[in-house]
Each structure stands twice: as C-alpha cells, then as structure tokens.
UniProtKB/Swiss-Prot annotation:
Keywords: Cytoplasm, Elongation factor, Hydroxylation, Protein biosynthesis. It is found in: Cytoplasm. CDD domains: S1_EF-P_repeat_1, S1_EF-P_repeat_2. The keyword Protein biosynthesis applies. This is Elongation factor P.
Length: 188
C-alpha cells in the first residue's frame, strides 16, 4: 500500500491508523509563523462510524487502507444478516448489523448500495442517496391546520419515521434523502 504524508491528506482518502481503517473527511494544513507546520484532520473510523479529530506533524505519514468500495444489490435480510450480490460476478456477501448500522431503515429489495470491504468483509453499507417509500402510518392532516409546526411524523414501509408535510396521507409514496432522513417530495 502507498504511504501518505500529512500534507497529502485529502477528503475521501482512506488511511490506516492504529491498525484500523479511517476515512479522511476534511484536512487543513497549517503553517504557523513560528514552529513546525502541521495538519488538522477530521477522520471517520470505518469500523464504527465515529468521528475523530487529530493533529499530524508535517513529517508524519500513514499507510493507505486496503479498503474497497463496491456497488452491490441488496437482496434480503434473514434476521441476522443482510445479503448483497455483485451484479457482475453474481457473488453474494453477507453483512452483519454492525456493518449495516442505521442504513437498515433505508434498504429496499434490489436497491443499489455501496458496500465498503476491508479484508474481504463488509464494514459499512451506504444506501442510495434517495429512496421511494410508502407511508404506512401518519396522522390525518386537517385542511387549514397550519398553526402547528408545519409537519407531522410518518412511519414508512421499512419502519423509518420521517417528518412530512400535513397534506401527505397514508398509502402515498414519498421520496426521502437517506443522508439526512428528510422528506424530499411526493412521488407521482
């Protein structure tokens, strides 16, 4: 694997620290008037998703992480594992609850997901940026009821709960941004 110096750190780069893979989310190179230059780096630990901020001297280096992002199709959940398939080789991979995390509430059958593999094992699953889900439960919106917050909670077919406008009803299909968990629009 390649070696990267701290001034080479860029958003999206995946490096190894303390034997674990991290993704660089932001990096700022600082050269003070007095003293040695350094880099302030925001990292995300790929195994747990926790965010860390570290400072590296300009002479510090890190090995590139041997992680692979693959586009896989979500097949099904057997209760313990979520199963994905590579559409080119038809090879199937299983991810556990730790790798899935909060993504489980956005996974639909046949959805294209990005699965990050480390040593051949899935460590994170990223659902599509937008999904279309049916509303299975929400309060009825009353005409002219605009004194409230302008929204109401709605339970979707996958169990996710999002805040939707008052005019949206049970049985309608809506588009949701999976990165923020927010309502985007109704689907015609």
């Amino acid at each position: 694997m390649a070696t990267y110096y701290s001034n080479d750190f860029r958003a999206g780069l995946k490096i190894m620290l303390d034997g674990e893979p991290y993704a660089v989310e932001a990096s700022e190179f600082v050269k003070p008037g007095k003293g040695q230059a350094f880099a302030r780096v925001k990292l995300r630990r790929l195994l747990t998703g926790t965010r860390v901020e570290k400072t590296f001297k300009s002479t510090d280096s890190a090995e590139g992480a041997d992680v692979v992002d693959m586009n896989l199709t979500y097949l099904y959940n057997d209760g313990e594992f979520w199963h994905f398939m590579n559409n080119e080789t038809f090879e199937q991979l299983s991810a556990d609850a730790k790798a899935i995390g909060d993504s489980a509430k956005w996974l639909l059958d046949q959805a294209e997901c990005i699965v990050t593999l480390w040593n051949g094992q899935p460590i994170t699953v990223t659902p599509p940026n937008f999904v279309e889900l049916e509303i299975v439960d929400t309060d009825p919106g009353l005409k002219g009821d605009t004194a409230g917050t302008g929204g109401k909670p709605a339970t979707l077919s996958t169990g996710a709960v999002v805040k939707v406008p008052l005019f949206v009803q049970i049985g309608e299909v809506i588009k949701v941004d999976t990165r923020s968990g927010e309502y985007v629009s109704r689907v015609k």
